[in-house]
């Protein structure tokens, strides 16, 4: 319910290592980060 909603601030940083891992392909990096956020969202949905 809306009165029980909680929010967190989330900051994600792509470091040079991850940038190099995906050969600077920002679409692949965005996809990976988006998947991470979805997993975290599902994990925190029940707390």
Curated annotation (Swiss-Prot):
One of its GO terms (biological process) is proteolysis. Gene3D superfamilies: Collagenase (Catalytic Domain). Keywords: Calcium, Fibrinolytic toxin, Hemorrhagic toxin, Hemostasis impairing toxin, Hydrolase, Metal-binding, Metalloprotease, Protease, Secreted, Toxin, Zinc. It is an enzyme of class 3 (hydrolase). Inhibited by 1,10-phenanthroline and EDTA. It is found in: Secreted. Expressed by the venom gland. Binds 1 zinc ion per subunit. Its cofactor is Zn(2+). GO terms for cellular component: extracellular region. Ca(2+) binds at residue 9. InterPro entries: MetalloPept_cat_dom_sf (IPR024079), Peptidase_M12B (IPR001590). The keyword Nucleotide-binding does not apply. It comes from the Eukaryota. Residues 6-47 form the Peptidase M12B domain. GO terms for molecular function: metal ion binding; metalloendopeptidase activity; toxin activity. The metalloproteinase is a probable venom zinc protease that induces local hemorrhage in the skin of rats. Degrades type-IV collagen, gelatin, laminin and fibronectin. Has fibrinolytic activities. Has high hemagglutinating activity on red blood cells. Cleaves insulin B chain at 29-His-|-Leu-30, and 38-Ala-|-Leu-39 bonds. This is Snake venom metalloproteinase jararafibrase-4. It comes from Bothrops jararaca.
